[in-house]
């Protein structure tokens, strides 16, 4: 790898000669492969070294073809770079009761799924992505993760100014110059320049200033980048504390994790992951608590009432008008504890959303573009209600409401390619929940001689390649591999 000369000079000055040489050497090595297991869905033993700052993070000995593991598509794990799993450590340290949290720059969903896994029950996660072409993969990954206390939005950071004091926690994994991704992304190396570092720093400050109002006084800001330089890291943390008003907080870490602290003359705590010291990619994180001086922020509900212009005009393409319809009890009973949900019909979709968050959700809908919320139970088609894939993925689905059919590995891959499904002749007609290793993959409608594949078209596996099943099973214990033979 040929590093930009300006990058080498600047990083050498930041790290010193010895650390910089070790970093250069580390960037020539293969990046480690790691996953984070979804313990709410899967209790299968996964082979590998544990990521020390993550309860369910695991390093793999080599990179399997994840695309061809049905359990990957079922949301049993997320392929995530190990350093960024440190967000979990922050939330475990500072969040012990239910919160409303915003992940501002969330796609593709690694930190959102990590946050959702450790947030206390009763917390609401709002995962936002400003880029329209990236928000769908964010929604897909959160749907697969299976938690219903989630809202996915597609908004500019400035839009959140209309929600003052709404969030207890805001995570800003801001767009950056990408120095920490050099060994995984050749484009990041090609596009790097000292000028771009300055552009990124200014963009990051704009994003932070835009969202600051939405963080309640005393709320927690998690600031992170995947870059090394001080301009986007320590200098921005100092700017937040000084200009926006915040205290920098410490996160307990173990010395054997080899996380690097502040590399400037300042003494506030920060957490920098360097590839030659920690097993992961380049990553930087700091935690700040917003000052409470000056009184409470104006409540969001009062703000919206007084600033009606912030609301979307429902007659001009704003929030879709809900149909007046009673959702059948048998559909509500597709969920565990249906009494805990509010049910509504949006277009042709039947959506369930946790009642405890309905007031917050109503406020979000007034100012944000909501892509996904709660769980979509099904779609109205004439007199029929077709169960939605979101229902198959949620951990809130009531077991036993649908007949199940277990698929072989080859059948599961065929289903995920959206190929025709052939079921055993003993299986009755109707909607069938298809499983692999007893984990739900999705629905099919059995019509007798064949079954209509209801897997989402846009999520299908497009490759026709079929690997040796044992190459997939390197993820799991020997018992799991034996099952797959």
Residue ranges of each PLM-predicted region?
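Class I S-adenosyl-L-methionine
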Residues: 167, 220-223, 227-351
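Mobile active-site "lid"/loop adjacent to the S-adenosyl-L-methionine
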Residues: 133, 171-210, 222, 226-233, ...
